[in-house]
C-alpha cells in the first residue's frame, strides 16, 4: 500500500514536471525597450539579439526595439553598436513581456591627452574619408578634398595642378560628384591644370566625405567609375575662419540655432608663383574666385528647407616668352628651345544653385523635393607663335628648326536643370529609399582652332601642290535633351547565430530622349561579419553601370582635305560597365591603437565604349561606340593611428585595362596604370599639440602615349612614372578652444596656425604630356612637358 502511494506520488510529480517543461518550451516572451548613449540620446540601428539564437531586432530612430522570442530558464540579451561598448543582460526564466532600457557608453580609450576611438565597420563600398588634418595639408591645386581622394585605394593622379583623378582605369569624366545629394558638374573646355581654377567643393564647408571606387548603390547616377558624396555642414552656434597664403586666401563664416543654420564662404586663388617653376617662362596671371552659401531652416520637426548657391569665376591669362627643355638619356641628351610671341586668355564662369524641401511624416518616413540648376560660360582664346630649335645638347648642329602658330576661338555655353523627388521609409530591419528625376541639358558650342607648322621653310605636312595645316577643326553645334531617371533600393540588416548580414539591393531605370534609349541597371552589395570574429567583414558587390554621353562624348568628326568638322551623333549609346568587386576588411589593434586593413579585387567588363585620347587633362573622344574591353586589379589599404591620435593610411593598387577598337587587337587604354601607391601620414611633436605635420606621397607608373591626332594603335610608348612628395608643417600660435583667454585680441580666436608647405620636396621633374616636333624628313621627337618643381608656400589660419 505504501509502495503504491509512493509510486503514484512520483508519477504525478514527473507528469507535472513534463507538462511544465512542455509549457515552458512553448511559452513566448516579448522583449522590448530602448537603447541610449551616455548623453541620453537614442542610438539608431543598435543591434539587440538573444545570444545563441536567431532572435533579435534593430533599433528604430528613437532607439526603441521590440521582438518576440521563445522563453528559456536563462536568456542572455546582447546590445551592440559600432562605436559603442557592447553590453549583456541576463534574463532568468522571463514570461509574458520584459522591458529593458540600456545605456551603451561610447567606445574610447585614453592615452594621455589623446582620445582614440574605434574604427567604424564598413559594410558597403562607400568609404568615409578622414578630413581631420585637411587644414594642415599642403595642397598645390586648391582642391583639398580631391587631393585627399587621390590617396585612396584605386585612385590615381598625374598632375598636382589639377583636381581631377582616375579611378580603376576610368577617365576623368567617369567620376560623379554629389553635394548634399545633388550632382554637380565641371567646366567642359579645360585642357590643362593651369586653366582649371578652384574645385567646386569648398573644404571649409564640408562635414562628411564619402567615396566609392566601384560597386556603389543604385541611388547614385549615370557614371561608370566612382562616386564622391559630400555633405555640407549644418552649424549650431557661431564659427568661422580666415586664411591666407602665397597661393590665395579664403574666408568662412557659419552661425545657427536649433532651427536655422547658415554658412558663407569665399575663396581666392592665384598660382602665379607655382606656375613660375614651369619650364615655359612668361607672364602667368591666373585669378580664381568663388562664393558659396548653404542655408537650412527647420521651422518644426515636419519641415526642412535647404538652399545652396555657388558663383565661380576663373580668369586665366598667359603671355609666354621662352622655353628651354633638356630631355633624353645621359648618352643622348637633347635640347629644345622655343621663343614665343602672342598670348592666351581664357574665362570660365560657373553658376550653381539648389533648393530642397523635406517633409518628415514621422521619424521613419520622409519625402524630399529637389531643384537644381547649373550653368557654365566658357571662353578659350589664344594666338601663340613659336620659333623652335632642336639640337643635341652642347652641339650647334640642329636636328630641327621651325616655327608654329596655334590659334583658337572657342566658346561654349551649357546648362543643366533638374527636378526630382526622393523618399525613404525605415522599418525594423529595412531601409527603403527611392527617387525620380527629370534632367534637362542644353549646350551651345562654337569652336575654331588650327595649328600651322613650318620646318626649314616648308609647311608641314609637306605637299608639292597645296598648303596644309597640321590640324584644323571647326565645330558649331547645339544639343538639347532630357533625361528621366528612377531608382529604388533597400538596405536589409539582420543578426544570425553565425554572424550579421547587411544586404543592399536596388535598380535604376533611365530614359534619354536624344537617342530614345531606355536602360535598366540592377545593383547589389552583401556584407557578412562572422560572430566568431566581429573584426572581420567580407563584402561582394556587383551591378550594371551605364554612362550616358554628355556633350564631349557625343562629338564625332569628319575630315576632308585636312579640314576637320565636328558634329553630334544621334546614334550614340551609353557606355556600359559591369562591376564585380570582392573585398574584405580586418580591424586590429597595435599597442592599443586601432588599425584597419582592406583589400578589394575587382573586374569590370566594359562594352559600348567610346575610345578617347588624353592630352594633359583634356579628353578627346572618337565619337562612336566602337570599343569593348576590361579593367581588372587589386586595391589594398591599411588605415589607422600610426601615431596615437592621428589618422594615416597607405594604399597600393595593381591594375590592368585594355580594349579592342573596331574588333582589332587589344591595346592598353589611356589610363592603363599598372602600379599606384599613395601615402597620407600625419604626425605631431611629443608632449605638445602645437606642432602638426602631414606628408603626402604619390607614385604612379607611366601611362601610354603616342603622337597627337593619331590612332590609339600608335600609342606604344610609356610616360615616365609620376613621383611626388608634399610636406606640410603647422605651428599653433594661439590655442583658445576652451575660451580661457578673456582679454586682448586673442579672445576673439579659437586657434591661430602658422604653416609652411614644401611642394615636391624631392624636386622631381614629372612629365604631364609631350610636345611633338617634326623635321622635314617627317621624323618626330617627343619633347616632355614637365610639371612644377620644388616650391615653398607659407600660410596663416585664424579660427574663431
Which ranges hold each PLM region?
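Short, acidic Ser/Thr/Gly-rich low-complexity loop/linker segments typical of extracellular
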Residues: 54-64
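Periplasmic N-terminal accessory/gating domains of Gram-negative outer-membrane beta-barrel systems
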Residues: 85, 92, 98, 121-175, ...
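Membrane-embedded beta-barrel scaffold of Gram-negative outer-membrane proteins
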Residues: 366-372, 571-625, 630, 754-759
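Transmembrane beta-barrel wall of Gram-negative outer-membrane proteins
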Residues: 241, 247-268, 281-320, 344-373
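C-terminal beta-signal and adjacent terminal beta-strands/loops
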Residues: 699-706, 731-800
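Short, acidic, small-residue-rich periplasmic hinge/interaction motif at the N-terminus
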Residues: 34-39, 46-51, 80-85, 94-138, ...
Amino acid at each position: 500500500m505504501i509502495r503504491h502511494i509512493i509510486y503514484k506520488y512520483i508519477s504525478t510529480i514527473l507528469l507535472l514536471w513534463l507538462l511544465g517543461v512542455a509549457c515552458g518550451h512553448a511559452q513566448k516572451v516579448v522583449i522590448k525597450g530602448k537603447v541610449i548613449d551616455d548623453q541620453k540620446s537614442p542610438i539608431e540601428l543598435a543591434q539587440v539579439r538573444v545570444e545563441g539564437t536567431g532572435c533579435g531586432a534593430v533599433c528604430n530612430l528613437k532607439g526603441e526595439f521590440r521582438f518576440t522570442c521563445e522563453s528559456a530558464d536563462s536568456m542572455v540579451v546582447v546590445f551592440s553598436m559600432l562605436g559603442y561598448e557592447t553590453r549583456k543582460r541576463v534574463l532568468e526564466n522571463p514570461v509574458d513581456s520584459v522591458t529593458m532600457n540600456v545605456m551603451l557608453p561610447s567606445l574610447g580609450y585614453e592615452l594621455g591627452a589623446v582620445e582614440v576611438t574605434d574604427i567604424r565597420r564598413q559594410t558597403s563600398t562607400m568609404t568615409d574619408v578622414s578630413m581631420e588634418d585637411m587644414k594642415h595639408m599642403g595642397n598645390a591645386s586648391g582642391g583639398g578634398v580631391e587631393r585627399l581622394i587621390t590617396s585612396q585605394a584605386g585612385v590615381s593622379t598625374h598632375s598636382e595642378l589639377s583636381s581631377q583623378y582616375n579611378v580603376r582605369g576610368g577617365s576623368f569624366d567617369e567620376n560623379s560628384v554629389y553635394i548634399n545629394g545633388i550632382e554637380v558638374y565641371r567646366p567642359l573646355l579645360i585642357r590643362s591644370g593651369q586653366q582649371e581654377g578652384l574645385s567646386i567643393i569648398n573644404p571649409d564647408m564640408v562635414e562628411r566625405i564619402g567615396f566609392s571606387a566601384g560597386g556603389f548603390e543604385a541611388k547614385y547616377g549615370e557614371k561608370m567609375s566612382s562616386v564622391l558624396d559630400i555633405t555640407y555642414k549644418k552649424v549650431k552656434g557661431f564659427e568661422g575662419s580666415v586664411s591666407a597664403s602665397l597661393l590665395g586666401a579664403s574666408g568662412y563664416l557659419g552661425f545657427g540655432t536649433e532651427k536655422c543654420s547658415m554658412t558663407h564662404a569665399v575663396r581666392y586663388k592665384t598660382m602665379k608663383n607655382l606656375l613660375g617653376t614651369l619650364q615655359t617662362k612668361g607672364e602667368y596671371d591666373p585669378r580664381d574666385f568663388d562664393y558659396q552659401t548653404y542655408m537650412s531652416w527647420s521651422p518644426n520637426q515636419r519641415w526642412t528647407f535647404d538652399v545652396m548657391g555657388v558663383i565661380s569665376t576663373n580668369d586665366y591669362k598667359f603671355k609666354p616668352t621662352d622655353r628651354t627643355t633638356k630631355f633624353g638619356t645621359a648618352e643622348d641628351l637633347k635640347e629644345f628651345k622655343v621663343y614665343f610671341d602672342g598670348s592666351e586668355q581664357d574665362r570660365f564662369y560657373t553658376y550653381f544653385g539648389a533648393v530642397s524641401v523635406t517633409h518628415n511624416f514621422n521619424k521613419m518616413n520622409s519625402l524630399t523635393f529637389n531643384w537644381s540648376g547649373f550653368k557654365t560660360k566658357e571662353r578659350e582664346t589664344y594666338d601663340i607663335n613659336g620659333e623652335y630649335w632642336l639640337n643635341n645638347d652642347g652641339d650647334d648642329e640642329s636636328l630641327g628648326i621651325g616655327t608654329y602658330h596655334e590659334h583658337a576661338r572657342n566658346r561654349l555655353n551649357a546648362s543643366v536643370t533638374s527636378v526630382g523627388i526622393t523618399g525613404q521609409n525605415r522599418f525594423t530591419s529595412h531601409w527603403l529609399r527611392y527617387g525620380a528625376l527629370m534632367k534637362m541639358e542644353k549646350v551651345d558650342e562654337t569652336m575654331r582652332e588650327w595649328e600651322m607648322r613650318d620646318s626649314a621653310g616648308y609647311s608641314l605636312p609637306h605637299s608639292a601642290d597645296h598648303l596644309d595645316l597640321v590640324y584644323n577643326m571647326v565645330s558649331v553645334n547645339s544639343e538639347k535633351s532630357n533625361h528621366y531617371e528612377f531608382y529604388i533600393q533597400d538596405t536589409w540588416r539582420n543578426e544570425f547565430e553565425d554572424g550579421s548580414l547587411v544586404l543592399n539591393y536596388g535598380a535604376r531605370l533611365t530614359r534619354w530622349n536624344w537617342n530614345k534609349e531606355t536602360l535598366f541597371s540592377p545593383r547589389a552589395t552583401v556584407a557578412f561579419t562572422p560572430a566568431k570574429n566581429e573584426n572581420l567583414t567580407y563584402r561582394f558587390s556587383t551591378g550594371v553601370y551605364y554612362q550616358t554621353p554628355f556633350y564631349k562624348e557625343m562629338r564625332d568628326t569628319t575630315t576632308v582635305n585636312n579640314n576637320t568638322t565636328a558634329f553630334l551623333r544621334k546614334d550614340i549609346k551609353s557606355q556600359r560597365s559591369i562591376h564585380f568587386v570582392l573585398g574584405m576588411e580586418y580591424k586590429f589593434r597595435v599597442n592599443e591603437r586601432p588599425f584597419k586593413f582592406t583589400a578589394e579585387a575587382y573586374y569590370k567588363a566594359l562594352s559600348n565604349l567610346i575610345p578617347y585620347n588624353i592630352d594633359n587633362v583634356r579628353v578627346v573622344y572618337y565619337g562612336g561606340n566602337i570599343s569593348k574591353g576590361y579593367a581588372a586589379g587589386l586595391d589594398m589599404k591599411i588605415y589607422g593611428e600610426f601615431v596615437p591620435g592621428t589618422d594615416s593610411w597607405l594604399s597600393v593598387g595593381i591594375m590592368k585595362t585594355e580594349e579592342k577598337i573596331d574588333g582589332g587587337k587589344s591595346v592598353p587604354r589611356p589610363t592603363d596604370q599598372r602600379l599606384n601607391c599613395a601615402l597620407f601620414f600625419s604626425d605631431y611633436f611629443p608632449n605638445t599639440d602645437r606642432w602638426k605635420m602631414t606628408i603626402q606621397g604619390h607614385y604612379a607608373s607611366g601611362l601610354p602615349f603616342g603622337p597627337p591626332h593619331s590612332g590609339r594603335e600608335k600609342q606604344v610608348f610609356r610616360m615616365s612614372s609620376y613621383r611626388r612628395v608634399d610636406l606640410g608643417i603647422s605651428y599653433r600660435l594661439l590655442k583658445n578652444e576652451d575660451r580661457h583667454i578673456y582679454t586682448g585680441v586673442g579672445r576673439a580666436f579659437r586657434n591661430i596656425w602658422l604653416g609652411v608647405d614644401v611642394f615636391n620636396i624631392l624636386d622631381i621633374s614629372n612629365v604631364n604630356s609631350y610636345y611633338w616636333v617634326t623635321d622635314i624628313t617627317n621624323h618626330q621627337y617627343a619633347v616632355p612637358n614637365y610639371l612644377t618643381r620644388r616650391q615653398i608656400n607659407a600660410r596663416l589660419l585664424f579660427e574663431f
